[in-house]
Amino acid sequence: MKACSILFTTLITLAAAQKDSGSLDGQNSEDSSQKESSNSQEITPTTTKEAQESASTVVSTGKSLVQTSNVVSNTYAVAPSTTVVTTDAQGKTTTQYLWWVAESNSAVSTTSTASVQPTGETSSGITNSASSSTTSTSTDGPVTIVTTTNSLGETYTSTVWWLPSSATTDNTASSSKSSSGSSSKPESSTKVVSTIKSTYTTTSGSTVETLTTTYKSTVNGKVASVMSNSTNGAFAGTHIAYGAGAFAVGALLL
C-alpha cells in the first residue's frame, strides 16, 4: 500500500514537470517569433530609406543634366555666335553653343601684264641678231610682315618677299647705212626687248598666295660712227662691231 502511494506521487510529479517544460518551450518559441518579427520590422524601414535616397539621387542627377540657367556666355574667352536649344521626346533639353570659325585665305594666283611697243627701227643691209637671258638672285629679307588677329584672338603672320626679276632678251638688232663714195655719219640702232617678271609670295599658315607681274621693256641704244667707203673697204666690218657695242649698251641700260 505504501509502495503504491509512492509510485502515484512520482507520476504526479513527472506530469507536473513535463507540463512546466512544455510551457517553457512555448514561451521560448513565442519569444523567438517576437524577436524575428522585431528584426523584420527593423529591416523594412532601413530598406525603404535606402530606396528613397537612391531615387532622390537619380532624380537630382537627371535635373542637373537639363539645367541651362547656370551657363553664362561671358564665361568663354569668345562669346558664342549663337545658341541652339533642342528638346527630345522624353523632355530632356540639350543646349549647343556655336562659334563662327575664323576666316582663312585660299590660294590665289593673280597675273597682270603690261607691254611697251618697240620704237625706232632702222633698216639696213647688215643685221646682227642675238638672244640671251640673265637671272639675278637676292638674299634680302622679307619686304614686310603683316600680322592679323582673328575673332578668336589667334594671331596669323603673313610674310611677303619680292622674288628676283628675270630679264630675257627677245630680239637684238643693229643696223647702219652709209653713202658710197662720200664721208657720212651713219647711226647704228639697237633694240632690246626684255620680259621682266616680278613675283611676291604671301604665306599664312598653310596657305600661299602668289602675285606675278609680267611686262616688256624696250631699250634703244644708238652708236654714231664715221666711215668712208671710198678710202678703206675694211670699214665694212666695223658696222658689225658697232652693232655689238650697241647691244652691250642696251644690256647695261636694263
UniProtKB/Swiss-Prot annotation:
It is found in: Cell membrane. Its main location: membrane. Residues 43-57 have a biased composition (Polar residues). Keywords: Cell membrane, Cell wall biogenesis/degradation, Glycoprotein, GPI-anchor, Lipoprotein, Membrane, Signal. Glycans are attached at residue 229. Disruption phenotype: Reduces significantly the growth rate of cells exposed to polyhexamethylene biguanide (PHMB). Leads to increased resistance to zymolyase treatment, indicating alterations in the beta-glucan network. It is a lipid-anchor; GPI-anchor. A lipid is attached at residue 232 (GPI-anchor amidated asparagine). One of its GO terms (cellular component) is cellular bud neck. It comes from the Eukaryota. Residues 27-42, 111-139 have a biased composition (Low complexity). Residues 1-17 form the signal peptide. Induction: Positively regulated by cell integrity signaling through MPK1 in response to cell wall perturbation. Induction is dependent on transcription factor RLM1. Expression is also up-regulated 7-fold upon exposure to polyhexamethylene biguanide (PHMB). Residues 19-57, 111-143, 167-191 are annotated as: Disordered. Disulfide bonds: none annotated. One of its GO terms (molecular function) is structural constituent of cell wall. Cell wall biogenesis protein that participates in the organization of the beta-glucan assembly. Involved in the mechanism responsible for cell tolerance to polyhexamethylene biguanide (PHMB), an antifungal agent. Present with 688 molecules/cell in log phase SD medium. This is Cell wall biogenesis protein NCW2. It comes from Saccharomyces cerevisiae (strain ATCC 204508 / S288c).
